[in-house]
């Protein structure tokens, strides 16, 4: 990279040294990624890969980015959330291990904390723009929430239609910004997005929300390239979603509010892998109530000792409300109007539409006041206030620093192996949505055992034969529920 490298946008390059120190600490806590670097360094399986990343620009993500680069990839990056970027991590990635703030020499990264919606989608566009590539774009996408994948698909769709819908048809502010971006980039006869998509070998998707989008596109017959659903890898969903959320949910609430959780009543919406972080609230001494639509998850919650009921039954009684569903319109403005004075409202699902922030802003006479970044009170005309964290977006990343490095090593090892799988074996993956092969899922788990002092028992050949598996695995069928 030349000394005049300016293909990036971060808040403050002077934070790079601090970021580099934190990255070094994180590497020690991320044995999976570091083992993959050592194993594949010589083979360079991602040589020739142009990876566009749209994933929270944190210290842990910095270790992922530098792992992809160590395996031969070129990388361009944006965050997948307007509040989740850690400025020192972004600066360290832009500067690189061998650069300085005056001479940055590393990865084009476009991310800073507190982006506007226009800035956020501009950053996503920049991450997808590869000036010197044959198609002007990437040949791989690493996504979290599906925004980079969505932008490519919408661009191709509207080029095929010959026009972009009017911004007057936008469903919300974010949709309006997307339409404005595509109106700007799609001119008469333009095939920018179609050309960009033509060389993409696949996408690896990190989270439930993005996976839902992929399955919808597959169902509708519009998916343009193969995808690996990393979210449903066991070493992701049963570790990142479970153990990570237990840690970062409490961290976010504590940093945002400094309230004592013990003795309070908390409502957790959803009891899937993320919602099971309810356990951490209980561990702090809260009385936890769960809402559910799924009878199986509701039964699990009840047998784990939680009261399971509807929001309507408890909306005026609880102190803390946390959405975890990945769905929309979970808490509406009318619900928030019924809450107790200074009730805390937050989300660890994904997008900001789990909580009706648009509806809240339209309540006649309501007043929004910033207490500190990503902590706002909303005062209703009767004087009652509620506290909303991260403007309804991910509180564990907006108000805190996300999941710990060790658990993210699992998820990001999954991502790295999924990228290698799609990039090196395109013939094995026709367009569709796939899960990470079981042997790779087990490999990721193995890479983390030594750090915890785990010693595995080894099957004898006759034992393996008896249960119909190989001595070295995989040990479970794809449909086994851990």
Swiss-Prot record:
GO terms for cellular component: cytosol. Pathway: Amino-acid biosynthesis; L-homocysteine biosynthesis; L-homocysteine from S-adenosyl-L-homocysteine: step 1/1. NAD(+) binds at residues 207-209, 241, 270-275, 292, 327, 348-350, 396. Keywords: Cytoplasm, Hydrolase, NAD, One-carbon metabolism. It catalyses: S-adenosyl-L-homocysteine + H2O = L-homocysteine + adenosine. The keyword Cytoplasm applies. PANTHER family: ADENOSYLHOMOCYSTEINASE. May play a key role in the regulation of the intracellular concentration of adenosylhomocysteine. This is Adenosylhomocysteinase. The lineage of its organism: Bacteria, Bacillati, Actinomycetota, Actinomycetes, Kitasatosporales. The gene is ahcY.
């Amino acid at each position: 990279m030349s000394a005049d490298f300016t293909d990036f946008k971060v808040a403050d390059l002077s934070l790079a040294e601090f970021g580099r120190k934190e990255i070094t600490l994180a590497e020690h806590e991320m044995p999976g990624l570091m083992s993959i670097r050592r194993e594949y360094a010589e083979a360079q399986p991602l040589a020739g890969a142009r990876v566009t990343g749209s994933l929270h620009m944190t210290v842990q993500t910095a270790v992922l980015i530098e792992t992809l680069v160590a395996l031969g990839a070129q990388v361009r990056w944006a965050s997948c959330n307007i509040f989740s970027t850690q400025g020192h991590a972004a600066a360290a990635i832009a500067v690189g291990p061998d650069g300085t703030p005056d001479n940055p020499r590393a990865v084009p990264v476009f991310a800073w904390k507190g982006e506007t919606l226009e800035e956020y989608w501009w950053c996503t566009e920049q991450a997808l723009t590869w000036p010197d590539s044959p198609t002007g774009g990437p040949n791989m996408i690493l996504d979290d929430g599906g925004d980079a994948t969505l932008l490519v698909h919408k661009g191709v769709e509207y080029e095929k239609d010959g026009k972009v819908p009017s911004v007057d048809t936008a469903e919300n502010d974010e949709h309006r910004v997307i339409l404005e971006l595509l109106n700007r980039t799609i001119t008469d006869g333009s095939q920018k997005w179609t050309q960009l998509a033509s060389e993409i070998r696949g996408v690896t998707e990190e989270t439930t929300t993005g996976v839902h989008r992929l399955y919808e596109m597959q169902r509708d017959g519009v998916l343009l390239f193969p995808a690996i659903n990393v979210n449903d890898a066991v070493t992701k969903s049963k570790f990142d979603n479970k153990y990570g959320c237990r840690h970062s949910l409490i961290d976010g609430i504590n940093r945002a509010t400094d309230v004592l959780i013990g003795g309070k009543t908390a409502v957790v919406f959803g009891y899937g892998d993320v919602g099971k972080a309810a356990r951490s609230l209980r561990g702090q001494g809260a009385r936890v109530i769960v809402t559910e639509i799924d009878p199986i998850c509701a039964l699990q919650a009840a047998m784990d000792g939680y009261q399971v009921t509807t929001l309507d039954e408890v909306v005026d009684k609880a102190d803390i409300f946390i959405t975890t569903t990945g769905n929309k319109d979970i808490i509406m403005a009318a619900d928030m109007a019924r809450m107790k004075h200074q009730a805390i409202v937050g989300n660890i699902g994904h997008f900001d539409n789990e909580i009706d922030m648009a509806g809240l802003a339209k309540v006649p006479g309501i007043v929004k006041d910033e207490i500190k970044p990503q902590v706002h009170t909303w005062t209703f005309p009767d004087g009652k206030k509620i506290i909303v964290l991260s403007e309804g977006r991910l509180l564990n990343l907006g108000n805190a620093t996300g999941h710990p490095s060790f658990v993210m090593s699992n998820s990001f090892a999954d991502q790295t192996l999924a990228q290698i799988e799609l990039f090196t074996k395109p013939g094995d993956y026709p367009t569709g949505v796939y899960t990470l092969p079981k042997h790779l899922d087990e490999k990721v788990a193995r890479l983390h055992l030594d750090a915890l002092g785990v010693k595995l028992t080894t099957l004898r050949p006759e034992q393996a034969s008896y249960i119909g598996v190989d001595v070295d695995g995989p040990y479970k069928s794809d449909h086994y529920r851990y």
